[in-house]
């Protein structure tokens, strides 16, 4: 059970990394090719210029939400770095709701589920300080599919290893696809599939439907 939990946790983290990398590619494409119509940035480029208005705040959040126009209600969650979450907590803006079994408090902000992940993008300011990218999601923002390998799980034993004591290796094979709604893949991977670095490039995606139909938005703050 413990091994299974560790394996499951590993693949969840890999899935999260690919979601974040793909979101970074969408953001880069949007800025390069669609005038940044999915992005609201209030971040300052130096520590000296940082104020409450350049950090996560209700006005900036609202502006990011309404890059979707009258489809703003389609957003259901926001993913933030832990430092941004700290700002939200300090502002007393987080409301906690219980899950269906009353065992867990789920953080929400303005009705959106809050997901905290330090894998989200942190970039250096031009002069000093850092900028945090938060991602707002709606249902169906990413499509997900999983295939079945011929041998999805197996244990390999090597008797000659471990000074003759033998070792066992667990092999887990996953075949899955993750793709953002409303975008076509335009890049060419160097290998069999896109690396995280390749997914984050502006050349990897191109939006093919109107902005309001894409349930994604970005907010950049200090």
List each model region and its residues.
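Structured, hydrophobic secondary-structure cores that serve as assembly/anchoring elements
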Residues: 1, 61-88
